[in-house]
Design a protein with these regions (language model features):
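Interfacial transmembrane-helix boundary/kink motif in multi-pass membrane proteins
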Residues: 2-20, 69-106, 110, 250-261, ...
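Hydrophobic alpha-helical transmembrane segments
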Residues: 9-16, 45, 49, 83-91, ...
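Hydrophobic core of alpha-helical transmembrane segments in multi-pass integral membrane proteins
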Residues: 17-24, 53-61, 90-99, 257-279
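Alpha-helical transmembrane segments in multi-pass membrane proteins
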Residues: 20-67
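Functionally important transmembrane alpha-helices
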Residues: 23-28, 182, 194-251
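Membrane-interface segments at the starts/ends of alpha-helical transmembrane spans
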Residues: 36-46, 125-137, 244-258
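Function-critical hydrophobic alpha-helical transmembrane segments in multi-pass membrane proteins
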Residues: 119-190
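C-terminal membrane module of polytopic membrane proteins
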Residues: 223-305
Length: 305
């Protein structure tokens, strides 16, 4: 009983420590840039790559130390069919969130409080809400675009699906661990609207990680989701590219249709991943049972002799 309690406390503290490192590194970089004279609103790309790079470094060191007692981030080999399924799930998830946001926009016409939350969300996700694009160097815009679908997904997945979910799996059924990390992931995003779809994404990515036992699968989903959700539109909106507004609108509309189209295949892919997971668990249970029966038979034979 005492060992169980200590294990629970240890896992919770490890998860909280990792979360604390995340915020500590973010604020440390923000402070350092301010001291050096960089406006984080203007140099958002520099801030993102610096903060997430530092976070990733400290979380990696944290993992290397913590895994010495017991591994908790898994990199099980996945089949090509599983990888294709994960890509489909990522695109379908982007479609679900698009519907979520369209629904929120529609309801905001009738709910003033929701309209305020929606305006706040739009301002938060708009790269140039505080500083006009003309005042932002092109190199910083490019760094920001690249970081949002590479380093950001890697770092956040390492924290939430890797460390937090990994620690929770030690002390509770994996299904509950998926829910806990998803709630923390949702709350971390702060805004009311953002919390809602971040919670959905956290559950889906947690379940896919559970199905595949391969950390790179939720990273892949997160990366594709971020690219379709923000990076691609930020590329189109770069004034240096000079893409006409009507062409941008047509491309954006086509992308929305593609997301919707992939929702049904994504659902089938998700069911397939679940089926593979369920079958593997049944096979493992059968092998364990056969091994135990073989040991029991050998013991009986030895006693009879």
């Amino acid at each position: 009983m005492k060992k169980t309690v200590l294990r629970v406390i240890s896992s919770c503290l490890m998860a909280l420590l990792a979360l604390g490192l995340f915020y500590l590194c973010s604020y440390a970089v923000l402070y350092l840039l301010a001291v050096l004279g960089f406006d984080s609103d203007r140099y958002t790309g520099l801030y993102c790559v610096s903060s997430y790079g530092l976070i990733m470094l400290f979380l990696w060191i944290f993992w290397r130390i913590a895994r010495q007692s017991e591994e908790f981030i898994y990199f099980k080999k996945t089949s090509p069919s599983q990888k294709v399924s994960v890509v489909l799930v990522a695109i379908g998830l982007a479609g679900i969130v698009t519907i979520y946001m369209f629904g929120a926009a529609y309801l905001s016409k009738y709910l003033e409080s929701l309209k305020e939350h929606l305006d706040e969300y739009k301002q938060t996700v708009d790269r140039y809400s505080d500083v006009p694009q003309e005042q932002v160097p092109l190199w910083d815009s490019m760094i920001y675009i690249l970081t949002t679908f590479t380093l950001v997904p890697l770092c956040e997945e390492f924290l939430f699906r890797g460390i937090i979910m990994g620690q929770m799996r030690k002390i509770m059924p994996v299904g509950f661990a998926v829910l806990v990390q998803a709630v923390v992931f949702g709350l971390m995003h702060g805004l009311t609207l953002h919390i809602g779809y971040a919670l959905i994404c956290g559950i889906v990515m947690g379940l896919v990680y559970m199905f595949c036992d391969n950390f790179w699968m939720p990273v892949l989903i997160h990366s594709i989701f971020n690219f379709l959700g923000s990076s691609f539109s930020n590329i189109l909106n770069l004034k240096q590219l000079g893409v006409p507004s009507d062409i941008r609108a047509n491309i954006s509309y086509t992308l929305v249709l593609v997301k919707y189209f992939f929702m049904f295949p994504a659902a089938l892919a998700f069911v397939y991943l679940w089926y593979r997971y369920k079958k593997n668990k049944e096979d493992e249970a059968r092998l364990i049972k056969e091994a135990m029966e073989a040991v029991a038979a050998e013991s009986e034979e030895a006693l009879s002799c």
